[in-house]
Amino acid sequence: MARIAGINIPDQKHTVIALTAIFGIGKTRSQAICAAAGIAENVKISELSEEQIETLRDEVAKYTVEGDLRREVTLSIKRLMDIGCYRGLRHRRGLPVRGQRTKTNARTRKGPRKPIKK
């Protein structure tokens, strides 16, 4: 298994699909990385040479991925909560942030129903 950005990339998948195993790289970015590295998208990871894998590593290193990206997202949410803006309050209360209705629905974000005590 090839190791890129601290992640074991699946060998038996095509390059474009295999790169999406890295957090922060979707299909479009994966295609851009393959094009920049000069590697065909339909080649499997196991068929790549060590030099080609090294060029993939260099291309992936240009983006914010994995731990750095997770940390960045967490810190931006924490910043919203610290400044006390509306979005931060919604995060703090565990409610939908982007204006969805909460009278009905939003069960995933709110958790299981709490029965009304009489």
Curated annotation (Swiss-Prot):
Instruction: List the InterPro entries hit by this protein, alphabetically.
Output: Rbsml_uS13_C (IPR027437), Ribosomal_uS13 (IPR001892), Ribosomal_uS13-like_H2TH (IPR010979), Ribosomal_uS13_bac-type (IPR019980), Ribosomal_uS13_CS (IPR018269)
Does the keyword Metal-binding belong to this entry? no
Subunit structure, as described in the record: Part of the 30S ribosomal subunit. Forms a loose heterodimer with protein S19. Forms two bridges to the 50S subunit in the 70S ribosome.
Q: Where is this region: Disordered?
A: 94-118
Question: Could you state one GO biological process linked to this protein?
Answer: translation
Q: Which terms are listed as keywords in the entry?
A: Ribonucleoprotein, Ribosomal protein, RNA-binding, rRNA-binding, tRNA-binding
Give the similarity note: Belongs to the universal ribosomal protein uS13 family.
Q: According to its record, what are the GO cellular component terms?
A: cytosol; small ribosomal subunit
Role description: Located at the top of the head of the 30S subunit, it contacts several helices of the 16S rRNA. In the 70S ribosome it contacts the 23S rRNA (bridge B1a) and protein L5 of the 50S subunit (bridge B1b), connecting the 2 subunits; these bridges are implicated in subunit movement. Contacts the tRNAs in the A and P-sites.
Instruction: Please report the name of this protein according to its UniProt entry.
Output: Small ribosomal subunit protein uS13
**What is an example of a GO molecular function annotated in this UniProt entry?**
structural constituent of ribosome
Pfam families noted in UniProt: Ribosomal_S13
What organism does the record attribute this protein to?
A: Edwardsiella ictaluri (strain 93-146)
